[in-house]
A protein has these predicted regions:
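Active-site mouth of glycoside hydrolases
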Residues: 3-124
């Protein structure tokens, strides 16, 4: 399923989807990949689609201020879930994230991925 290509409009103050105005109606589901069990993901997506959401903003890495228990799956090798060995990606995590993104698209919702939160950048 394709949701169409997003572009910036001519005034550079909004988005177009396949040439038509696109309103970015998003939910911030920052910790989806680390904190939402697969059994709950379909329910969540169904509910957000019913509410008219068309975008989910998700961190690809664990949210720095997460307060909910994590599922214990990390994007990179880690002993504590805070410090990562960036040279050792966890393929199971990334496969799960990709499957969750595909499920969102199947519900008509675009994943908008935040690649790196500032706490992972030294000196920020």
């Amino acid at each position: 399923m394709s949701l169409g290509k997003l572009t910036v409009n001519g005034r550079q103050d909004g988005f177009l989807c396949e040439g038509k105005p696109f309103f970015w109606f998003a939910d911030t589901c920052w910790s989806a990949f680390t904190s939402i069990p697969e059994a709950d993901w379909d329910y969540y997506l169904t509910r957000r689609a019913e509410q008219g959401m068309n975008v989910l903003q998700i961190n690809t890495l664990p949210q720095w201020d997460r307060c909910c228990p994590d599922l214990g799956i990390w994007p990179y090798a880690s002993e504590d879930g805070v410090h990562f060995d960036w040279s050792r990606p966890n393929q199971a995590y990334w496969d799960r994230a990709a499957a969750m993104c595909r499920a969102a698209v199947e519900h008509g919702i675009r994943p908008a991925l935040v690649l790196m939160w500032c706490n992972y950048v030294p000196g920020t």
